[in-house]
Amino acid sequence: MQESQSKKMNEAKTNRGLHFFKIVLRPPYRLWLILLRYLHKSYNRVLLAYNGVLLAYNRALQLILIPKTPIASCVLHGRPEVHSLVCHRHMYNYILAIKSFLRFYNDVTVIVHDDGSLTKKDKRTIKKHVENINIIDRDYADEKIDKIFYHYPNCRRYRDECVNALQLFDYMLLSESDKIVSLDSDILFFKKPETLIDWLRDGTEIIHFWEQEPAGTREFLAKINLDDCFVPVNIGLLCFYKETMNLDLLEQILSKVEIFDWCTGQQIYSILLKKQIERHELSFFEPSQYQDQTEFRDGGDEQIARHYWSSVGTLDEYLPDRKKIIKELLNASKVDKI
């Protein structure tokens, strides 16, 4: 019995020794592969932990600090309208975005389009933070637009399939104002946006966020033989007009599109804006001042607004800027109370 156990122990030692020599004698590239695998796993663990910290920090900002920022206000009806499509997940992002603008200029009517995910509590929270804001419920919008789309089946198909189609149709079809601003919920204003305010007061052109090569736009236009309608537009911030809507043209375009995606609306805006060129000059916000995520620049005093593309994840840039805006809003509130 003892001899058997002793024999097994000797064999185990021999196997460990052989295993050691096998590792030493392996080709160097295999050792590198093992090392890289180990480092990759470690990196992923660190990255997950880092993202977890960022998300926790983001949630803390939402639940603790943003609710403490001072109430903003706007005009209930009759002014140029600032339209935003807002979801439950980005509700606090939107509140901070619109407050960052209204602190500089509030002679506007503000419209929130419910994407269908806003809860009753979300709507109460938004109304609490922005006096006189208008919220268009998804059910109400669907009913109104459905009647308009009676003779436009492809427009209805697109709106039913893609939630952000509301940015294309509802902003214009449900607007009471001739002047419309499309504002995404992941934009922050750092300084008084003079170009935007001048347009709201008496501008006559169309002004858009500059994006040099919007995703898929050239390919989309080529497929429907409208290459000459390319505009380097990002609709995250866009100043335009209710008359831009052309349902007959949209029905014709959408009949040629089999599969819609998140970029379809922006691609179609390129066409609509180009068709307006005889009535309104096409212009764009200075990219160094109004920075789209593809054009972010470090520091400096130039930046007036930033668009973060939060849907694809730019927390590294967004969270520090967000904290800065919150701090400025809170400090302004303290000054007002003195």
Describe the function of each predicted region:
Residues 207-229, 322:
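A short, conserved beta-to-alpha structural element at the edge of catalytic cores
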Residues 128-174:
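Active-site-proximal specificity loops/subdomain of glycosyltransferases
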Residues 83-94, 160-164, 227-231, 258-265:
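Aromatic-acidic/polar surface patches that form glycan- and anion
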Residues 212-214, 230-312:
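Catalytic core and acceptor-binding pocket of nucleotide-sugar-dependent glycosyltransferases
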Residues 105, 130, 175, 276-277:
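A structural signal for short coil/turn segments at secondary-structure junctions
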Residues 3, 7-147, 308-338:
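N-terminal anchoring/stem segment of glycosyltransferases
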Residues 89-90, 117-118, 141-143, 187-189, ...:
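Short, solvent-exposed loop/turn segments at secondary-structure junctions
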Residues 163, 167-213:
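GT-A fold catalytic core of metal-dependent nucleotide-sugar glycosyltransferases
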